[in-house]
């Protein structure tokens, strides 16, 4: 309970979510990350990137002991067992998937003996910088600041100790208590308590019904099903947008400053996720993303961006939350993402691959989709020979990245092969794209290959390689005679 957030490890967190946002729950019973009401909203629990004083909700036995945890089969319901000298209790954490619920429910069940518990809710809005006003009425506490409001419903009397809303309870074998935290608007009546066990049953049913549609034989069924559930948790149910991750500023490497905000929808990452879901038989999610993309593109598809907010809006200005010390003390903590303004040519190929995969499983293109794709291809024709920041979103000078060029080639190739999209373009345009595809291939084979070593290079004029090049054969790109294919 007393461990400060900088001493924690990311592998000790479990994910719970409701398709609107997600929370990270540590094995010690502390929820250290939660943005409400959306994935890309401000965090009200930011201890993951700082200390407990930056917002968290700790619920655990008062006495020290050991803990173990697991997900309930085929769900995002997380169970943590605490074993102590006095007894054994189980903490069940989940987020109800009911529309408009905006809730975290925590149920404690006594399995053996008698265990004393303490709940300490330390709310901090605006990524740990704003302490709310708190009003307590017996077993209900309300915290609010600006437009945001959070209400805690507890099983007994609540009190305030410093900045924390505290509750203590004793659970014996066979007994059960429930806590419910809900988000609402500070201008409206605080949302009521949720029937915990009914919500638990409905949440389990939701996840099990969804994963129950997966019927493909695999050597690793449990791992695949868990991966699919996690991907599903990254989809913003209200729009169909797919985020890259529910967190910001977890460093790419220990003690590095490569800390980025991934709570947004990258077209590249979303296309990869969509393809995986299609392969697993989940076509509704693919169609929802296609529709999200059409809305995000609007009436000027040639201005399509590499990433968006979950609702399809485009403002992702990057700034630094200077008051947060960072995960395990690794600064800076970035909010927003400046890479949104970068040119990354690879997104167009991945986007067209995703559209092609959707068509193969019967998701028919709409007229608007045809217009979007034709416009995107016209845009690729205008910019494909320019340098970009590449798959790795390098923040230095742009280069002619080989992977980006091949991805741009793939976009044109997929368009040429998709006769069902040609209705949005005249015959001359299609013929021009055939020639462009061939011209792009010739240039890549000339400038993107080290003939002496028999390998592609990371970017034109370089002798470096990078892992993205391993994907070129999967994109259907003929390998310029490197492996004797020509």
Regions found by a protein language model. Give the residues of each.
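Acidic, mature catalytic/reactive cores of soluble proteins
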Residues: 1-486
